[in-house]
Amino acid sequence: MKKELLAGTKGLVTTLMVAMVVVCIFQLFSAIGNFANRNNYVLSHSVFVIAIITWILYRYSIKNYLKKCPIKIALYCPIIAISILVLLSVFGTYIYIPNLFENAVTSIAQNALLCTITLGLLQPIAEEMLFRGVVLGCLLKGKTNPWIAIGISTFIFSIIHLNLTQMISAAIFGMIAGWLFYKTRSLWPSIIIHTTNNLSCCVWSFTSLSTITYGMTKEQLLIIHILLVIICIVVLSLTIKRITSVH
């Protein structure tokens, strides 16, 4: 397992370093060309993500992981993502967890198009290629216990987010994404789940929660939240059971 873990870690570090060098070059040209503006952070993030995708496709043999997966599993993935997102949103209403990078995320979310492309599409693809394709892929190639491999890749995936709010959701999504990758040996299920989650968050960032809950009492909100939790747990249980029977 040590050999596979070393290979996965090396792939992770190398990929991130290459992406950071590309971003530094981009920032240098931006400074020379006086290109600094409010979208500079967003563009830098986009360059970073694109560099990760390009480097992984060039350096690592993950094309086999981009093979087709069963249609039924692909259709179940958005249901899983939305159910988990709703559960996290409900619990987040009652448990305050500080977000250290809220301003950075807000700056991206101010531009709907860039938010959708960068956070909603490119970033999920890059992260799944890196953490499931490279890290988990290396671990599973050896004799590592699948759940230990999934746990290690999920832990690294969570830590890399660097703030408690995202670490919790990343851990939950990471375990499910890792399990789907292990079952199908395809990145598409985890990419679909990750993309659905991020796109939903982008849409949610442009929606005012106060307009949805306007006029509701605390008791009414509590009842709605309890019903949502029950529904989501039932849906998740049935969906995971269906996926297990499919593949």
Specify the residue positions occupied by each region the protein language model found.
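N-terminal, membrane-interfacial amphipathic/helix-forming hydrophobic leader that caps
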Residues: M1-P70, I82, V86, L199-H247
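Alpha-helical transmembrane segments and their helix-entry boundary regions
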Residues: G11, T15, A149-I150, M167, ...
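Membrane-interface starts of transmembrane alpha-helices
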Residues: G33-I50, N111-T118, N145-S153, S186-P189, ...
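Juxtamembrane helix-loop-helix connectors linking adjacent transmembrane helices
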Residues: F35-R38, I62-M129, G137-K141, G215
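Residue-level signature of the transmembrane alpha-helical core
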Residues: P78, I117, L121, I125, ...
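Active-site His/Glu-centered metal-binding helix of metallohydrolases
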Residues: I125-L130, V134-V135, N163, T196, ...
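Membrane-interface helix/loop boundary segments of multi-pass membrane proteins
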Residues: A126-I152, W179-S186
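Functionally important transmembrane alpha-helices
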Residues: Q166-Q220
